[in-house]
């Protein structure tokens, strides 16, 4: 699969030069802010994902460029900051010839990441928590509102830090602690 950036380079070439450059700079800045976000193509648009969740889509139109932060409530959270932009429930329009401002882009995408994190834990099923760079902080399963089954905890750089099992919310069996290079540092029995 081609990277989003190469797709974006090709995709945004269909627009006038300044418009394509503004879109490309915006998506590259989002990738810089969230280096662990996965590149994807969704609805025919360059997209950044965090796990199975969409962080943001990027697209150009005849009279504006748009960010689609994958949640209508993001626009509501930043009503004051977005007052100079045309905003609808699912999109934020910005000028054809200027990239979206980095400080505001960061605020919007961090808010979206917080929404993704807040969608967990579930009483039953998968739990995932993400760092602000888009990398996984921890992942496991819940059963009847308690941690149950295999769990993994990661460092900010994405390397595994600890893994083991929970049974009814209690650590169980062998837990392994890893050095940043992946080497096993110790094992603990519960």
Language-model features, listed with the residues they occupy:
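Charge-dense, helix-prone N-terminal extensions
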Residues: 1-132, 180
